[in-house]
Amino acid sequence: MTGIIRNKVFFQIKQGNTPLGRVVFELYNDIVPKTAENFRALCTGEKGIGKSGKPLHYKGSSFHRVIKNFMVQGGDFTHGTGIGGESIYGRTFNDENFLVKHKIGCLSMANAGKNTNGSQFFITTAETPHLNGGHTVFGEVVEGFDIVKKVENAETDRSDRPKAACVIEDCGQL
């Protein structure tokens, strides 16, 4: 550790009308400061409206892709389908580094290839070494992994979308 205090942020998640609980993440702002700051600011909503015309905020967005024994993915607050999202730096930003390797419970950037990070993220629910070197790990679940598992176990359609929406009803910094 470099003496930098790692930020902690939270999601309050519900499935349909049922509250699931709180997930707390510790962000690796000492290793990937730009990536961690993007996620932190999208949790607080402090950057206002983005270039898309939508608030730069995860609040109200859903987990649009859930694959059992792999990961849960969210962060598309512009479309809600997995085709959108936007970073606090503009539509996308470059990969910062791949120093941290994927493990169960890590928080990592979803992307469409090299240097295409936006707001979409995923939380791993299984060992995923095949993702190393292609997705930036920028944090980990430190509380509420049981809530992540509830999202992972949601009934999904053929497109891996939960049939009862799993929504981030609140989020912020601790």
Curated annotation (Swiss-Prot):
Its EC number is 5.2.1.8. InterPro entries: Cyclophilin-like_dom_sf, Cyclophilin-type_PPIase, Cyclophilin-type_PPIase_CS, Cyclophilin-type_PPIase_dom. Signal peptide: none annotated. Its main location: mitochondrion. GO terms for biological process: protein folding. It is found in: Mitochondrion. GO terms for cellular component: cytoplasm; intracellular membrane-bounded organelle; mitochondrion. It catalyses: [protein]-peptidylproline (omega=180) = [protein]-peptidylproline (omega=0). Residues 10-173 form the PPIase cyclophilin-type domain. GO terms for molecular function: cyclosporin A binding; peptidyl-prolyl cis-trans isomerase activity. It is an enzyme of class 5 (isomerase). Binds cyclosporin A (CsA). CsA mediates some of its effects via an inhibitory action on PPIase. Keywords: Isomerase, Mitochondrion, Rotamase. PROSITE patterns: CSA_PPIASE_1, CSA_PPIASE_2. SUPFAM superfamilies: Cyclophilin-like (SSF50891). PPIases accelerate the folding of proteins. It catalyzes the cis-trans isomerization of proline imidic peptide bonds in oligopeptides. Belongs to the cyclophilin-type PPIase family. PPIase D subfamily. This is Peptidyl-prolyl cis-trans isomerase D, mitochondrial. It comes from Dictyostelium discoideum. The lineage of its organism: Eukaryota, Amoebozoa, Evosea, Eumycetozoa, Dictyostelia.
